[in-house]
Structure formats: C-alpha cells, structure tokens
Amino acid sequence: MNFKKLLGVALVSALALTACKDEKAQAPATTAKTENKAPLKVGVMTGPEAQMTEVAVKIAKEKYGLDVELVQFTEYTQPNAALHSKDLDANAFQTVPYLEQEVKDRGYKLAIIGNTLVWPIAAYSKKIKNISELKDGATVAIPNNASNTARALLLLQAHGLLKLKDPKNVFATENDIIENPKNIKIVQADTSLLTRMLDDVELAVINNTYAGQAGLSPDKDGIIVESKDSPYVNLVVSREDNKDDPRLQTFVKSFQTEEVFQEALKLFNGGVVKGW
C-alpha cells in the first residue's frame, strides 16, 4: 500500500473514532433532556390547598414550559412518606416544626426548597383596636395544646409582650417566659373555646381554623398577626438526593406569584400571609 493510501485509511479511521466519541459524549445529554421532560410530581393536601396550587401548575406550564402533576392526599402523614419512597419529587403542605418532627421521628432525609404561605395565628380583641392600647395586667387567652401554646407565645414575644428563654423555641411553654414587661396574665383554654372568650379577656390568640369559623380574618380583624418570618410558614420540600433538580426552583418561582396569593386570599377568606 502506498503512502497516499495509508494516509487515507488513517484519516477515515480518525474521523470514525471521533464520531464515535462525539456520539458517546452526546448520549448523556440526550438522556438528561428526556428525564427533565417528565412531569414534576408534587404532593399537596386535597381541598382548597390543591385548588390554590393548581394556579402555580398553570403558571409553571405557561411561563416556564414545566409540566407539574399534583398528587393529592387526605392525611398529613402521607405526603412525606410518598416523598421518602420516591413516589413524589416534592411536596407542599408542611411547616418547619412539622418537618423537623417528621425527620426526627421517621429518619427521612428531606430538604427545604422554598416557602409558600403562612396560615397565621393571630390575636383578636373586642376591647382594643391596637396592641399599644393593651394595659398592664391585661388577661390574654392562648390555646392549651402544646404546639399552639408555643406558637401563641412566639407571637406575643414578636410584639414585645414577653420574652422567652430561647426566642426560637417552637416547643416553648409558660415556664420559658423570662420577661413579662406588661405583667400580662396568661390563661390557657381549649382552642375551640377561644372565640367565645373574647367578651371576657382583653386579647385572645386564635388559630386560623377557629377564627375563620367565627367570621374573623387575621388580615381584617387581627390585632397582631404572624409574619412571613414565622417558623410556621408552609414549605416546598424535596428529598436530599434530588434537591438540586432545577425544576424544583422553577416550581417555587411559579408558586411565589401574586396570582397564587390572590387565589389563596379568595379561598381562605383573607386568612393567609405571603411566605416570601
């Protein structure tokens, strides 16, 4: 074989080898694109929360080209179990304290991706219009169940009515109060009774469910209301092993919109606060 033929064979071989390498190099990218075309599965609680999240689903599709499939649940233990078992990519239903307890009790490896909304606890009154009007020695009613007791104390602390030993303790009790500048008298009662106590106390801290049943809205009637910085903000949560999936941040962006917030205000009679 002469030199020209040898050179030709070598060039053909080199080109063939390069083409093979290029095909191999491109294969993972093609696979990745195919995987990202799958709908993002997000778990939510059935009812108004699901209706509200449908607005985010629509925005994700129309603005970002992301398909989101909502999976609805009726029990609070289900969305984290489904996420843990990889039946979901994310869920949007729980607060920080609930998530921390689930991780502690069940060993789930979960990650916070972003905030959604706060269904705020608030303090209501028939005797004052502004918290500055609260007199020394006033009686303040709060829920008597552990999680809402702590939540009420944190709300009172946020507005300068008391100080807790650990200012971020979501399991705080009255025993954790170290300062009470207005000498308020705290009375604990069953959550369902608090709205009926408004005639007898200066202030009552009532959660959203029972306030709503009594026609009270934190937005319109609350004297003091939880803010977006509350540890009780609801979250978008994924697993640790998929927290870097870019589709998750796209879903969060789709949720954190005025359209979703306005739908939530309508569905929950003004009883929500933006968590972002």
Curated annotation (Swiss-Prot):
Lipid-linked residues (N-palmitoyl cysteine): 20
Disulfide linkages recorded for this protein, renumbered to the chain, are none
Q: Which UniProt keywords apply?
A: Cell outer membrane, Lipoprotein, Membrane, Palmitate, Signal
Please state where this protein is localized. Answer: Cell outer membrane
Q: One of this protein's Pfam families, by short name?
A: Lipoprotein_9
Q: Does the keyword Signal apply?
A: yes
What range does the record give for the signal peptide?
A: 1-19
What is the first-listed, main subcellular location in coarse terms? membrane
The keyword Membrane belongs to this UniProt entry's keyword annotation = yes
Q: Output the Gene3D superfamilies linked to this UniProt entry.
A: Periplasmic binding protein-like II
S-diacylglycerol cysteine lipid attachment residues:
20
Tell me which GO cellular component terms the UniProt record holds: cell outer membrane
The UniProt entry lists membrane topology as: Lipid-anchor
Q: Which family does it belong to?
A: Belongs to the NlpA lipoprotein family.
Q: Under which name does UniProt file this protein?
A: Outer membrane lipoprotein 2
Q: Which organism is it from?
A: Mannheimia haemolytica (Pasteurella haemolytica)
Q: What is the lineage of its organism?
A: Bacteria, Pseudomonadati, Pseudomonadota, Gammaproteobacteria, Pasteurellales
